[in-house]
Amino acid sequence: MIRSILCCRPVRQFHSSFLSLNSASPALNAGIAIDAWLKRGTAKSNIKNRKKYDHHHNGENRRRKKPMAVRWSSGTERAKEAANHMLSKVFETNSKGNIRFFNQISGKVEDSNIREFAKGIDLSQHGINIVNIINTETEQLPFVKLVDTKTALKKYSDYLAEKKEEELKSMGLLPRKFFENSKTNEDNLKHIKISWSIKEDDLAKQKAHDITSMLKKGNKVNLYIADKEDLGGSKWMENFENVEEEKPPSKKRLRPSEIERRESIIEQLKLLVSDISTDPIIEGRANGKMIIRLTPKVNKDDSIDKRSLKELKKQQRIEKLNKKLQRKKERELQDD
């Protein structure tokens, strides 16, 4: 039995295993050595085969998960980076690249694939943004929206800034003042809820006071206008995430008089902030939900007055210096 096994294996490899055993019982030791050598050979072959299997199947997984590249033919390098960043976010959410978007031509929310959606996008005019994540029964779908290039680049710059901040924070290179300033910038945006059912007296007094006082302090203000049920709860802001694409419920048709009243509220708000805010950015519809974004207006007269005062002081210093020089010359002439 031992002889037949030895004939099937290289003698040199077996000999080293055999000699390492105790020579007290040659037959027993020979059997143990052969058994150990066979097991070792089997383990090596198993590891080798396992590596081949893992390499083959991991390669398949990598090929399967690799998203199809989109070649951009327009836009700056920065715009392309911003678009590719959004593509990667889409594939992180949905490995197949499936998305949901609002079709402005049909006026409907439709499902598609990011590869198809990205075709023909002019990055010099538009960019891509993910405004929400939709959970279906089978998968998660990023809700994608076309935005202007400026907005897309701003969002990408914010992402890079946050990423850099996290890196510096982890390295302990950011001073405390930086965090305080960041918190101040976040607190600079104020949110005010307004119900469509608000009374004119409340709008003209309490809400008007809240809005104007915040703008005068230099705060940006977002006005969220909707029915009361959309303004309640701790997560009420989620109701305004897709306010541009959202269509009002077909069952809920408002009377013309109600539409007119709501439009009157909007006009009152615009008139209220006309002197202290830049042109409001209005999103949504009067028969649904709306967001009015307000930015405090920089008082040009104040800045002009400050510059004038600075120039006046500078001129006064020059005149004072000239007088000193003149007096010095006069004294020198008198001494001569």
From Swiss-Prot:
Domain of life of the organism encoding this protein: Eukaryota
Gene Ontology process terms (BP): mitochondrial translational initiation
Subcellular location, record wording: Mitochondrion
Boundaries of the annotated transit peptide in chain numbering: 1-41
Disulfide bonds: none
Region annotated Disordered, chain positions: 47-67
Keywords: Mitochondrion, Transit peptide
Matches recorded under InterPro entries: AIM23
Record-level GO cellular component terms: mitochondrion
GO molecular function, one term: mitochondrial ribosome binding
Family of this protein: Belongs to the AIM23 family.
Name of protein: Altered inheritance of mitochondria protein 23, mitochondrial
Organism field: Candida glabrata (strain ATCC 2001 / BCRC 20586 / JCM 3761 / NBRC 0622 / NRRL Y-65 / CBS 138) (Yeast)
Source lineage: Eukaryota, Fungi, Dikarya, Ascomycota, Saccharomycotina
